[in-house]
């Protein structure tokens, strides 16, 4: 490749799909080229949302009530949705950009929504693995920017309110978030740092939370890269 031919020491993957490609990060390592980002192992662990949920639960980080295992079939999904309690959010484990997500409000619409979300996941991410969460009504989408070095030091750079969305994609970001108190801001920031430390994270990343109307917050996912809107 050009990178090898030019004897580059490092490569920055930008903010697209390549930046979250664990295989590419591993290839850089094999070629003795520094991948400016987290390790392939962390990209894989946090990029798979089912695995990320499990990791955060083990670290004591609050997550949205939901499945602890991957879901592949409508039948198993229905069983788990009944246990969680409707309404539920059906999500693709490898999803992103609002793809592979559907809300199911009852048993009657569950099968249709599950199949639609799973087909989107297969088409967009070549993965049929799903998971199910309790649907948080009237939520706020609040995310924290974190930075981490290779020595285990992690800081956060404050929060953004990303609640104004269209088709599960952010339209507007506000900072600081006026919906949280200074005390809650500190608590959420500390949790974001703890989440990053739990996986030995390095480089820039984003910890995303859902905040319910009672001011309870839950880990939703982690972006293992700089955000596309913050190049």
Residue map of PLM features:
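N-terminal beta-alpha lobe that positions the nucleotide/phosphoryl donor
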Residues: 1-207, 211-230
């Amino acid at each position: 490749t050009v990178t090898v031919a030019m004897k580059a020491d490092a490569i920055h993957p930008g903010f697209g799909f390549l930046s979250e490609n664990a295989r590419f990060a591993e290839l850089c390592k094999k070629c003795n080229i520094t991948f400016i980002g987290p390790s392939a192992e962390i990209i894989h662990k946090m990029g798979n949302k089912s695995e990320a949920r499990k990791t955060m639960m083990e670290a004591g980080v609050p997550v949205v009530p939901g499945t602890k295992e991957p879901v592949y079939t409508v039948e198993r999904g229905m069983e788990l949705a009944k246990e969680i309690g409707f309404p539920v959010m059906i999500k693709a484990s490898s999803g992103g950009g609002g793809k592979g997500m559907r809300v199911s409000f009852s048993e009657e619409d569950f099968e249709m929504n599950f199949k639609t979300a799973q087909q989107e996941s297969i088409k967009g991410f070549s993965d049929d693995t799903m998971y199910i969460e309790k649907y948080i009504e009237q939520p706020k989408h609040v995310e924290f920017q974190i930075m981490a070095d290779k020595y285990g030091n992690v800081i956060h750079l404050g929060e953004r309110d990303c609640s104004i969305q269209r088709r599960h994609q952010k339209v507007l970001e506000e900072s600081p978030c006026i919906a949280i108190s200074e005390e809650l801001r500190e608590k959420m920031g500390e949790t974001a740092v703890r989440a990053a430390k739990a996986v030995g994270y390095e480089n820039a990343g984003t910890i995303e939370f859902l905040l319910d109307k009672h001011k309870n917050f839950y880990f939703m996912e982690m972006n293992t890269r700089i955000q596309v809107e913050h190049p």
